[in-house]
Amino acid sequence: MNSIVNITPIIIILSEHSSEHTFGFNSDIFEANVINILLLLFGLIYVLKQSLGSTLNERQLKVLAAIQESEERLEQASSRLSESEKQLAQTQIIINQIKKEAQLTAEKVRSSILAQGQIDIERLAITGKSNIETAEKQIRRQIQQQIAFLALKKVTLQLENQMSSDIQLRIIDNNIAKLGDQL
């Protein structure tokens, strides 16, 4: 407020001086301010146009370059995203195929194991029957041998009891004669 009071005498002196001379301060506020503002504005535009213009042009070019670079990055990111989505879809297809193949393989293995188990059971049954038949034959043979042995023993005992030395000599001579004819 104090500076406004000090300026007032200066304005009065300038206005008195302007009435005496052709160049001076115009006390009409509307007329003087519009011209002064226009002069100041044109002066600023003229002075700052070149430096601000080149700075603004550089800034505009940088902004446009940044926008273009961002758009390129967005386009690259979009293409990478679409490529990744394609790869994901292909991977899902491959995973599904692998799962199907694994299920088929598991089913084949299970069927093969069951079939092999059935074959093994049949083979064991046949082997068991064969072993039983072999054991029966062996037991029959042993029984037959035992019967033959007992029969021979009984016949031998009977012959020893019933056979005299004359009969034994006749049998020996008869067998020797048969052997002599064959030679």
UniProtKB/Swiss-Prot annotation:
User: Which top-level group of life is the source organism from?
Assistant: Eukaryota
The protein's role, per its UniProt record:
F(1)F(0) ATP synthase produces ATP from ADP in the presence of a proton or sodium gradient. F-type ATPases consist of two structural domains, F(1) containing the extramembraneous catalytic core and F(0) containing the membrane proton channel, linked together by a central stalk and a peripheral stalk. During catalysis, ATP synthesis in the catalytic domain of F(1) is coupled via a rotary mechanism of the central stalk subunits to proton translocation. Component of the F(0) channel, it forms part of the peripheral stalk, linking F(1) to F(0).
Give membrane topology per the record: Single-pass membrane protein
Quaternary structure note: F-type ATPases have 2 components, F(1) - the catalytic core - and F(0) - the membrane proton channel. F(1) has five subunits: alpha(3), beta(3), gamma(1), delta(1), epsilon(1). F(0) has four main subunits: a(1), b(1), b'(1) and c(10-14). The alpha and beta chains form an alternating ring which encloses part of the gamma chain. F(1) is attached to F(0) by a central stalk formed by the gamma and epsilon chains, while a peripheral stalk is formed by the delta, b and b' chains.
Q: Which one of the record's GO molecular function terms can you name? A: proton-transporting ATP synthase activity, rotational mechanism
Q: Where in the cell is it found?
A: Plastid, Chloroplast thylakoid membrane
Q: Name one Pfam family in it.
A: ATP-synt_B
Q: What is this protein called?
A: ATP synthase subunit b, chloroplastic
Q: What more does the entry say?
A: In plastids the F-type ATPase is also known as CF(1)CF(0).
The beginning of the lineage is:
Eukaryota, Rhodophyta, Bangiophyceae, Bangiales, Bangiaceae
The encoding gene is atpF
Main location (coarse class): plastid
